[in-house]
């Protein structure tokens, strides 16, 4: 069983050197809310915190509920996204990601974490809301999405939860980055089955857990 939200919140108000195992993050600080407590961005299975370092920021993902084999699943997902980033050169569709099986100490016990680069950019939802009257920018976004999906199809992978909050867009609309890989599909994890079916407002209404493939 994983810690709950309150346990993570209490732990992350301590000095990070006492709870984060990886020493390279001991000098980091957690982004705080206006109330002076760690700011949370939550997902289906994980809480996301912003780690602020001197020269760059990272996303810290901690799990608070799950019903799938995290370690084996993410080990395979990270392999494929890092490989695709190398192949794509300047257009990385995924952020650099690492999985640490014993990454955080909460109430004396060690739990897994995921560390990801903090990717700049507007969410696709915000980008469209701001620029919907700008045909050039919307066309740039359309082309970027088309190119990304071509790469996905060629490599037999699927993000699994394409929705406005999971796609970050550059100011000119030409570069996009996908985040939140909990529902991702690649052939090497087909045996695990689907961990989620994505945001219901952006998926086919007949989609169920038994549909777990590159489509």
Question: Where are the regions that the model predicts?
Answer:
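Catalytic-loop of the protein kinase fold
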Residues: 153-170
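Conserved structural core of kinase catalytic domains
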Residues: 93-140, 191
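Conserved activation segment of eukaryotic-like protein kinases, specifically the C-terminal portion
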Residues: 192-207
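Activation of the activation-loop gatekeeper triad in protein kinase-fold domains
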Residues: 179-185
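ATP-binding glycine-rich loop module of kinase domains
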Residues: 36-38, 44-95, 107
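Conserved end of the kinase activation segment
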Residues: 206-215
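Juxta-kinase regulatory segment immediately upstream of eukaryotic protein kinase catalytic domains
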Residues: 1-39, 72-80
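Short C-lobe core helix of eukaryotic-like protein kinase catalytic domains
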Residues: 144-153
């Amino acid at each position: 069983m994983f810690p709950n939200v309150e346990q993570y919140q209490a732990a992350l108000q301590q000095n990070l050197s006492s709870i984060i195992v990886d020493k390279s993050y001991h000098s980091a600080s957690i982004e705080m809310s206006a109330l002076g407590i760690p700011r949370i961005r939550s997902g289906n299975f994980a809480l996301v915190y912003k780690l602020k370092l001197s020269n760059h920021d990272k996303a810290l993902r901690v799990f608070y509920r799950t019903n799938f084999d995290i370690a084996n699943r993410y080990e395979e997902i990270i392999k494929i996204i890092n490989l695709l980033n190398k192949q794509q050169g300047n257009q990385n569709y995924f952020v650099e990601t690492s999985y640490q099986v014993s990454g955080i100490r909460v109430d004396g016990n060690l739990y897994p974490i995921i560390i990801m680069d903090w990717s700049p950019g507007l969410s696709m939802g915000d980008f469209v809301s701001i620029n919907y009257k700008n045909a050039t920018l919307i066309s740039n976004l359309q082309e970027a999405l088309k190119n990304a999906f071509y790469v996905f199809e060629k490599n037999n992978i699927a993000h699994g939860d394409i929705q406005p909050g999971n796609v970050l867009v550059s100011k000119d609309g030409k570069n996009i980055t996908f985040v939140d890989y909990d529902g991702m599909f690649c052939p090497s994890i087909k045996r695990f089955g689907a961990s989620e079916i994505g945001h219901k407002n952006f998926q086919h209404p007949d989609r169920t857990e038994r549909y777990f493939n590159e489509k």
